[in-house]
A protein has these predicted regions:
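Metallocofactor- and cofactor-centric catalytic cores in central/energy metabolism, strongly enriched
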Residues: 31-155, 171-193, 205, 210-214, ...
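Conserved thiamine diphosphate
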Residues: 157-173
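Short, Lys/Arg-enriched N-terminal segments with co-localized hydrophobic residues
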Residues: 11, 15-30
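C-terminal catalytic subdomain
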Residues: 323-436
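Extended hydrophobic packing segments that form well-structured cores
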Residues: 394-497
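Long, internal scaffold/assembly segments composed of regular secondary structure
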Residues: 256-257, 263-344
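Conserved anion/nucleotide-ligand pocket segment
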Residues: 38, 191-219, 363-386
């Protein structure tokens, strides 16, 4: 029997490339502010004095948005900017010396900058790069003040494309760092950085084998490894053995019971089933710590119900609420998109079935699962019940569904598959509504309104995507698409057009 961690004290962060350490109940949180490396371009015959103002503007913009920064000293080059190839290499080496201290780079173009120094500076940045160019001002278009960054930005992006240096461009084409539009750009770029840095290398736990009935959740483990996703696979019998070895009065088990009772309503769950759920929760925490898992998928039926007399939905719900994406039914691919959305939004994600029509409204759908939805995505506190599907044929075997309703909020839905060695993914947006679902509908569900839903469903069906979709809070399609295509190399299927 391994030495299991105390309840909630899971490690996690050491194994991921990104994600944060747990708090007192194991919620993932960032250990430091997201940090940008600031880089400034120059060109000899342009008004270089404008760069000094840009340094001040950019520092103010970044810090007021709540982020941190690193910046090469002003004395290192003329105005602390890069123009020549040698200056670019100087910045390159400075950035290399600070590797691990920055999450993305903002390349600031106060004027029509020299693209050669820029390419030398950032060709090995290894993180997302945001292209920012200053606008010109009416009334300040004389030679001493004209910037021409509108044009110069194309020279930089042209050469970066030739060098195959990935970069991000946003609307508007030119934008002042102290404007509200750039504050929005910064927020989205920070989300892109979190997704890219968190997805390019991480560990994903596969606890149990795929049940043969669920061929819909097949995946290619070697394809995932090509994208930096390591799958750690465990037999369910090992989990059963560790659960059996735990004593009912073990302090770790008692602490987990307290945590679960505080998390949701356990008032009707028989004590033996509650204890078993707590033991499984302790074992899942051990897997997360021991193998430094950043996300997991669990074989949730029907062995746990038959032999342990529980349904682990509420445990997945609690893990998701902690920022540890946890998918049911060994749906590894859903766990991948759940992690991406958690990184983008910094809020829990969940996996749901495309389950029911909602009356005659063709743009509405009931999204449902038995109970793995994070409590923070629900309209009110859930209630742990017996899974009605299992109770029908084997009463007393399905305790563990966290039942309730999903709150109304803007949402993004996304999922992926592996095919021919590639990760193929889609992302789109909609909203959960306040439409009621009748009381007799079991599990955790919500009504989603999705524009042009019927055409999107046809594209999902033709594309071979599964009956699951991952859902996250907020609209983040553009952030995910940028991260997936420009930096991570996923193949994105556009279901919106």
């Amino acid at each position: 029997m391994p030495n299991l961690p105390a309840c909630g004290t899971i490690g996690g962060d050491e194994g991921s490339s990104y994600g944060g350490a747990p708090d007192s109940v194991g919620r993932r949180k960032n250990m430091r502010k997201l940090t940008f490396g600031l880089c400034f371009g120059n060109r000899g015959f342009m008004p270089g004095e404008l760069i000094l103002g840009a340094r001040e503007d950019m520092v103010k913009a970044v810090t007021e948005a709540g982020y941190d920064y690193i910046m090469m000293e002003e004395s290192a080059t003329r105005y602390g900017a890069v123009e020549t190839r040698s200056e670019g290499l100087l910045y390159h080496d400075w950035l290399k010396a600070h590797e691990g201290q920055y999450d993305g780079v903002i390349f600031c173009q106060p004027i029509f900058v020299d693209e050669n120094g820029a390419a030398a500076a950032l060709q090995d940045a290894g993180v997302p790069i945001l292209m920012q160019a200053y606008p010109d001002e009416i009334g300040k278009m004389d030679f001493a003040n004209r910037r021409d960054a509108y044009c110069g930005k194309f020279s930089v992006t042209d050469v970066f494309t030739q060098y195959q240096i990935p970069f991000t461009v946003m609307k508007p084409h030119v934008v002042h760092p102290l404007s509200p539009r750039f504050a929005e750009n910064l927020r989205d770029f920070a989300a892109i950085c979190r997704v890219v840095n968190g997805m390019k290398r991480f560990n994903l736990g596969c606890i149990g084998a795929r049940t043969t009935a669920f061929k819909t959740v097949r995946f290619d483990e070697i394809a995932l490894q090509k994208y930096g996703i390591t799958v750690e696979s465990f037999d369910l019998s090992e989990l059963f053995q560790m659960v059996a070895a735990l004593k009912d009065d073990d302090e770790k088990v008692l602490a987990k019971i307290r945590r679960l009772e505080d998390y949701t309503d356990f008032s009707i769950v028989p004590q033996p089933n509650k204890i078993t759920l707590a033991k499984i929760g302790c074992v899942l925490d051990w897997y997360i710590q021991e193998y430094r898992l950043d996300a997991l998928a669990l074989r949730c039926w029907n062995e746990m119900e038959t032999y342990l007399r529980v349904c682990p939905c509420v445990l997945l719900s609690e893990l998701n609420d902690r920022g540890i994406p946890a998918s049911c039914e060994i749906d590894i691919c859903s766990a991948i998109t759940m992690r991406a959305m958690w990184l983008a939004s910094e809020k829990p994600a969940t996996v749901l079935d495309w389950n029911n029509n909602y009356g005659d409204d063709e743009d509405k759908v009931v999204l449902f699962h038995c109970g793995p939805v994070a409590q923070s995505l629900m309209a009110g506190k859930g209630k742990v019940t017996e899974h009605k599907m299992f109770a029908k044929g084997d009463p007393g075997s399905g305790w563990g569904c966290n039942e309730g309703r999903i709150a109304a909020f803007p949402m993004t839905f996304s999922n992926c598959q592996t095919k021919d060695g590639k990760i193929i993914v889609y992302a789109s947006e909609g909203a959960f509504t306040q439409d009621e679902i009748e009381d007799g509908y079991f599990g955790c569900a919500g009504v989603a309104q999705i524009p042009d839903l019927q055409n999107k469903l046809i594209k999902l069906a033709r594309g071979g995507f599964k009956h699951h979709t991952s859902v996250g809070m907020g609209h983040m399609k553009e952030v995910l698409t940028e991260a997936f295509t420009i930096y991570l190399g996923y193949d994105v299927v556009d279901i919106d057009n």
